[in-house]
């Protein structure tokens, strides 16, 4: 539905992404036909995903030669930036269009150790396993906090490491407080987004 364009995301990586100039216009037209249509938050490279990339470049031991699962991946920038360092990687989102685009980029980059799946963090099948789980700015809706904490805790209890990137917004503290006992490491990043500087915290969660 959303027009895509090939963009240089890093010195080494070009990805197909939704055309930023077209997304709002297309969404506006679609919403006139369906007033309940949710905004495609997946269709943007968010500051949190850029901070996640920086963190994983600085600390690759969290993903090197490991099975990695990115949940709520959207475009999947962190996954694509580390795919060649992992054993296997799953890029997942609940939005089918996001997953279709991820599959296009997997083929574009000729990644044999990578697959994209439609997954809901509330109901991840038990056969989906990972050493490390990536979450970038998934905690934006307070009504989802309890369900997200339950899913995160479930993964921590089976021995997964979780790398979580989140903007410093007013709702962040109540969410992070629910996970306070699992915080192993925190790093802060300043990410330029247009004319703004966004403060992003990256947490490593372990049991």
Residue ranges: model-predicted function:
Residues 1-207:
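S-adenosylmethionine-dependent methyltransferases
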């Amino acid at each position: 539905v959303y027009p895509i364009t090939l963009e240089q995301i890093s010195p080494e990586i070009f990805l197909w992404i939704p055309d930023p100039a077209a997304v709002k216009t297309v969404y506006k037209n679609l919403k006139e036909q369906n007033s309940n249509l949710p905004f495609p938050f997946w269709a943007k490279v968010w500051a949190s995903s850029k901070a996640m990339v920086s963190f994983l470049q600085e600390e690759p031991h969290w993903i090197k030669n490991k099975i990695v699962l990115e949940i709520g991946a959207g475009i999947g920038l962190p996954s694509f930036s580390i795919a060649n360092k992992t054993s296997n990687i799953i890029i997942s989102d609940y939005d089918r269009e996001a997953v279709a685009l991820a599959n296009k980029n997997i083929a574009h980059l000729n990644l044999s150790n990578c697959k994209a799946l439609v997954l809901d963090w509330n109901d991840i099948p038990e056969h989906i396993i990972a050493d490390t789980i990536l979450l970038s700015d998934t905690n934006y809706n307070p009504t989802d906090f309890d369900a997200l904490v339950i899913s995160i805790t479930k993964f921590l209890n089976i021995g997964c490491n979780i790398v979580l990137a989140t903007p410093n917004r007013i709702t962040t503290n109540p969410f992070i407080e629910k996970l306070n006992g699992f915080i192993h490491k925190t790093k802060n990043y300043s990410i330029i987004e247009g004319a703004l500087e966004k403060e992003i915290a990256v947490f490593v969660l372990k049991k």
